[in-house]
Every structure is written in C-alpha cells, then in structure tokens.
C-alpha cells in the first residue's frame, strides 16, 4: 500500500546534493513561486523525506560580499528550535548559480491556505487553536536578542500536519535578524505588509499585522485587498489607513475585534505575548465554542453547525486519498472520495449541493453564529428600531468651503439629541462619518445606513456636484476614543482636526441652522459635539431669556435716559421646538410686573397655552435661577468695588440700581453703556455664559 510507485523513474535519482552529502534533491517539483522552487529531497542519515527550497537571487544582491552576509544570517536560522517553527535543517549559498538553498521538514497537508480550502467547514475552536500555535511561534522568534522577524507571514507560508492538527510557521529563508542595517528593506507580500514596511522603518510588530491578515484570509478564503488589481492600489489603501473590504464581511464581533487589534497602527499594536493572553483565544478544555467558520458562497446557502452534532457526522481528520505526501506544492482538488466507508464503521451519506456538504441535521434549528452579514435581516432590524425616533439633518457651508452639519434625533419621550459635526467633501464619505458617529456616540438604536443616506441627501443639496453612494473602504478611525470617558466642558470643546461648534458659531454669528449652547450642555466625542435637551427644558430656558431681555430694556431705558424704539420692544426671538419653529413675541409673551420678580403668561398664537400647574412650576424654577444669578453678580460686584477709573485713577464705589442684578443677558446687551459708566475692566464678560446654565441646575 505505502510504496513509492507514484514516483516516476526520473525522480528516483538525485540531481543535486548538498555540500555535506547528507541531503539529495530529486527532480520532482512540489511547489513553485515567483522566486522560490520547492523540490522533494531525502535525508540519507535519518531516512526521512525533506523539502529542498531553492531561491533564485538574480539581481537581489549585487556583490559577493552581500552573498556572504546573507549566508551568515540564514545560517543562524537553523539554530531556531520550536514546536511551532518549521524545522530548519541546513542552508547554504550556491555562489556559482546565485542560489540560496535551505532544507526543511516536509508536511503532509501542505500550506494552511490549501488545508483551509479543502476543509471549508471549520469550527471556530479549531481556528483559535491554529492562532495560538502561530502566536507561540511568533513569540519565540520575537523573544530573541536581537529579535527575528519573519517579514513574509501569510497562510501560504504556514504549514499543517493535518493528522495531528499541527501548525508551524515556515519559509524563514527570507527572514532576517533585526538590525538597523537589515530592517530597512521593503520585503514581503503587498497584501500582508504593514504600512511601516513601505516606509522601510519597522520592527517585529510587522509580523503581528501580517498575522491579522492571515486570520482574515482563514475566515474569508480571500487574499486581503483582493478588490485591488494593482500593487499600487494596495499601497495607496494601506498608507491611507483603509482596511480591506474582506474585513467588513466578518460578522462575528469577537473575530472582527481581534483582527482589528492586530491591524492597529504600530503605536497601538500589541505583541504576540499579549495576544496569547487575549480573552478571544481563551478556551478551557471543558468549554465548547460551537460557532463555525464558514465561507460565503455566492451560489449556495450558508449552512451552520448544529448545536448537537453526532460523532458519526464528523469528517475524518485524515484520509489517505486526500492527505498524500505533498508539501509546499500543488494538491489535488476535492473529490467525491469522501462518500465512502470509514474505518470507524459509519457511512458518510453527505451529499454535495453547490459545493457544500449537506447534513440533514442542519435543516433543523441551528445555534451557530455566522461570520458574514445578512443584509436583509439587518435592514429589517434597523427599520424596526428607527420607527420610534424622528431623525432630521440640516447643513451649512462654511466660508472655507467646508460643510458643517447638525443631526437631530427626537424620541417619543421628548428627549432631543443635537449632534454637530464637520464634513470634508474631499476625504469623508457619508458611510464613514455615519459609522464613526454611531461608534463614538453609542447610537446602537439608529441605523448606520439610514444616517448615511440622510447625510448624502443633505450634502447633495449643498454641493450639487456631490456623488452619493455607500463605500465600504472606510472603517472606524477612533476606536480608542470610543472607550474614553466623555467629559463635558460646558459646551467648550477641544479643537478637532475639522474645528469645533464654538469656533463655527463665533465665526458665523448669523447662523440660524446651528443652535447650540442656549438649549443644553454639550459633550465632545471626536469630531462630534452633542447637546442633549428635553422639550420642557427648551421652553423653560426661552421664557427665562425673554424675561431677561424685558428687564434689560427697562434698565437700559433708566440708565441711558432714552427709551427703546417700538421695533426693539416688538423684537422676535426664534427658538426651535421638537416639532416646529416657534416665534413668540416678547411683548405678547411676558407681562412684566414692575418692582417684582414675578411674571405672567400671555400665550401667543404660535405657543401652546400652559396649564396652571405648569405655570407655577416654571415661575418657581425661574425664581430659583434668578436668585442664583443675583448671588453670582453680587460676589463679582464686591470684588470690583475698589476698582479705579482708568483716566483719573480715583477709586470708584459702585452702587447697584434697582433691577441691575435682575438680568445676566442684560449686561451682555448693554455692554457699551456699562463701559461708559465704569470702564472696560468692570464688564463681567464671564457672566455671558450663565445664559446657558447646565441642564443639571434645573433638575436640582
């Protein structure tokens, strides 16, 4: 049975031997790449088959000195001994033929990519087992001093002994011992190369990036950036921070999060040791993780592993018809030889439908977790969740050509979220901004697609040349910021790359679309500034502002000796209600009682008539707010009593007049009058912010 009859007569004789005479190479090619050819070879001392790897240097090296240096580096690699590193028996440089030859162990199941393609149905537990073995091998390489970096890690360079589930890192012939002079070379496969490799300044963490791409390849069966047709396109995407499209096919949140952790920027990327301690890879011996890793099939259904799978439904791990002694080479494709009698006494009756193994148990209720998105189910869920909220969006063009948008989300309970954010039409897409917004502001109840479509529609109205459409090239840009604590700075945000709401309001005083601080207290989340208010709080604040304006007009009339015009008395104040835009005239809204701090309501034709109970509550709250402002003003006034006049230098004592302490907003509006009386240093500019008291002050 086990004989060498499959070898042709020409392969029975050595065509080349190593300098020691121990290893002989046959003319049988097991695999071939761009610069390397793998032959079957034999170890005469041990009597085992090995793999003879031959690398053509061509113009890689320009002098004999370079060859000698490379020989010394590769020779050190045979000292690496680890159970998850391919055994490296010997290596030498053939200077005459400009070849590098190295002999390694032979594997029964080929590369991890070939093995994964043959076995499409793999439980996620098995994938975690492979990941742990690969990480142990990387940790061993990186623990050397100086570290050894692989520089070309991919599933084609990871090998499997399928009968034992053993995974080993191979193809170390192109690896280098990390030194300053040796690490500065751009080597590897473009799809698996980290951004810092293109910059030719990197360390051992480039292998972690490649490892993340290997997991993505194991899950999706595709090379990363398979959507690109040219290496230049891959380079552009990698350097701009765009992740491969295949990443967005992964639905399992744990798998996706683990991959993103490996693909993080070099400053945030973790080591192999830290990844081994990651909760994702922790599975106790008695624990069962029943999620299956399936490949998305465009022609057939996606079957999931049932919760209870009898032993006789499991495929054998090893089959002599499939696992022939091939390594590093081409493998026969799947055949119908699986449908035969196995040694365990059970018949396999699985039939193939569209390339998938069919199992009767899989037609029943399943409990697996799919790794790929089901767009129809997601859309239905989003529509169900978004039915309880009203989402609108408005935008405005800035002087520099940029856009500033406000997203307004109102629910049935009267809670309103106003989210202000900039939008760069050159670099941003509606989908990327919507995805970032949902992650930053924890907006799980609102669909990303719906928000993206609304952003597209508003931008199209502001920029006629805008071309809307979803693009899945962008991913979450601030994952670390999403976990950071949200700190409220009383609506004064930190400066972002696109500016802030406060900067926009200062530079655009006449903006009607953007209304912010008077309605609530804001929080900054990355580029987004959020102000959350309630409908009753909006009404309360507007009434308080109207009373302040009435008192300030009376004060100004007494201090300046002239009356305001009839137009100023009838000045309108606009504010936004959750349902409509209300216009309440100050003269009709407030009937001020001279000499008292109370007021009465006179409903206008645009405002709802409040009940007696609501009116009493509003009066009580306004009296509390007024008293608080008066206390603050008295404290500031006491500190300024001994301030000198700028011109004469004489000490001035300020005597507050009746009603002077009644309005914070009045001081802001009558700033010129106060300057004439007391000088610029007496103007309490900081008091302007009390017109936007925090929401918490009203509830206390």
Curated annotation (Swiss-Prot):
Instruction: Give residues annotated as binding ATP.
Output: 104-107, 154
Keyword annotations: ATP-binding, Kinase, Nucleotide-binding, Phosphoprotein, Serine/threonine-protein kinase, Transferase
Q: What class of enzyme is it?
A: transferase
**EC number(s) for this protein?**
2.7.11.1
Q: Where is the composition biased (Basic and acidic residues)?
A: 551-565
Q: Where is the Protein kinase domain?
A: 24-281
Comp. bias regions, Low complexity: 314-339
Query: Acidic residues composition bias: which ranges?
Result: 566-575
Q: Where is this region: Disordered?
A: 314-345, 551-575, 647-666
PTM details?
A: Autophosphorylated.
Catalytic residues, per the record, are 171
- Phenotype caused by lack of the gene: Plants display delayed flowering and altered expression of genes involved in the photoperiod flowering pathway, such as ELF4, TOC1, CO and FT.
Name the Gene Ontology molecular function terms of this record.
ATP binding; protein kinase activity; protein serine kinase activity; protein serine/threonine kinase activity
| Expression triggers | Expressed with a circadian rhythm showing a peak in the evening.
* Role this protein plays: Regulates flowering time by modulating the photoperiod pathway. Phosphorylates APRR3.
Its protein name is: Serine/threonine-protein kinase WNK1
What organism is the protein native to? Arabidopsis thaliana
């Amino acid at each position: 049975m086990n004989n060498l009859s499959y070898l042709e007569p020409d392969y029975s004789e050595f065509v080349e031997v190593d300098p020691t005479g121990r290893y002989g190479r046959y003319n049988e090619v097991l695999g071939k790449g761009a610069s390397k050819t793998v032959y079957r070879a034999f170890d005469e001392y041990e009597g085992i088959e090995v793999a003879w790897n031959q690398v053509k240097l061509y113009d890689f090296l320009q002098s004999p000195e370079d060859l000698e240096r490379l020989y010394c580096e590769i020779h050190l690699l045979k000292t690496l001994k680890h159970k998850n590193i391919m055994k490296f028996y010997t290596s030498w440089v053939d200077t005459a033929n400009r070849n590098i030859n190295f002999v390694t162990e032979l594997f029964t199941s080929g590369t991890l990519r070939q093995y994964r393609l043959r076995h499409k149905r793999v439980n996620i537990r098995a994938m975690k087992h492979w990941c742990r073995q690969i990480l142990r091998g990387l940790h061993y390489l990186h623990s050397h001093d100086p570290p050894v970096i692989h520089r070309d890690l991919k599933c084609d360079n990871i090998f499997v002994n399928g009968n034992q589930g053993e995974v080993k890192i191979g193809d170390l012939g192109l690896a280098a011992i990390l030194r300053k002079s040796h690490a500065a070379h751009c080597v590897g496969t473009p799809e698996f190369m980290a951004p810092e490799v293109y910059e030719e300044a990197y360390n051992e963490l480039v292998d972690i990036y490649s490892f993340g791409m290997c997991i993505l390849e194991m899950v999706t069966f595709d090379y990363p950036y398979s959507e690109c047709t040219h290496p230049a396109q891959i380079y552009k995407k990698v350097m701009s921070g765009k992740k491969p499209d295949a990443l967005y096919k992964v639905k399992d949140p744990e798998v996706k999060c683990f991959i993103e952790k490996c693909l993080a920027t070099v400053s945030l990327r973790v080591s192999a040791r830290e990844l081994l301690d990651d909760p994702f890879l922790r599975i106790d011996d008695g624990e069962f993780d029943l999620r299956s890793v399936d490949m998305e099939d465009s022609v057939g259904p996606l079957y999931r592993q049932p919760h209870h799978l009898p032993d006789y439904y499991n495929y054998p791990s090893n089959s002599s018809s499939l696992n022939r002694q091939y390594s590093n080479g081409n493998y026969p494709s799947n055949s119908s030889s699986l449908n035969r009698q196995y040694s365990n006494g059970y018949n396999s009756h699985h039939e193939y439908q569209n390339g998938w193994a069919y199992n009767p148990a899989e037609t029943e209720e399943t409990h697996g977790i799919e790794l790929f998105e089901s767009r129809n189910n997601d859309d239905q869920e989003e529509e169900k969740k978004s039915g309880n909220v009203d989402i609108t969006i408005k935008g405005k063009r800035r002087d520099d050509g940029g856009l500033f948008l406000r997203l307004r989300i109102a629910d049935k309970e009267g809670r309103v979220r106003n989210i202000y954010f900039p939008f760069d039409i050159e670099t941003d897409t509606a989908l990327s901004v919507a995805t970032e917004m949902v992650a930053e502001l924890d907006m799980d109840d609102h669909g990303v697609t719906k928000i993206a479509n609304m952003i597209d529609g508003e931008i199209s109205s502001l920029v006629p040349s805008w071309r809307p459409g979803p693009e899945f090239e962008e991913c979450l840009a601030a994952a670390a910021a999403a976990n950071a604590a949200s700190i409220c700075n009383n609506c004064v945000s930190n400066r972002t790359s696109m500016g802030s709401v406060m900067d926009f309001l200062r530079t655009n005083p006449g903006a009607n679309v953007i209304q912010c601080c008077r309605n609530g207290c804001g929080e900054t989340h990355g580029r987004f500034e959020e102000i959350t208010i309630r409908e009753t709080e909006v009404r309360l604040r507007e009434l308080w502002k109207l009373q302040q304006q009435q008192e300030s007009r009376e004060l100004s009339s007494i201090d300046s000796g002239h009356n305001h015009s009839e137009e100023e008395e009838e000045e309108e104040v606009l504010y936004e209600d959750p349902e409509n835009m209300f216009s309440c005239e100050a003269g009709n809204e407030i009937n001020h009682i001279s000499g008292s701090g109370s007021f009465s309501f006179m409903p206008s034709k645009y405002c709802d008539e409040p009940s007696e109970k609501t009116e009493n509550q509003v009066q009580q709250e306004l009296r509390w707010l007024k008293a608080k402002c008066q206390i603050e003003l008295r404290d500031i006034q006491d500190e300024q009593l001994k301030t000198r006049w700028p011109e004469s230098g004489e000490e001035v004592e300020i005597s507050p007049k009746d009603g002077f302490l009644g309005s914070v907003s009045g001081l802001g509006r009558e700033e010129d009058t106060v300057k004439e009386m007391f000088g610029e240093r007496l103007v309490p500019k900081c008091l302007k912010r009390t017109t936007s008291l925090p929401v918490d002050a009203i509830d206390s």
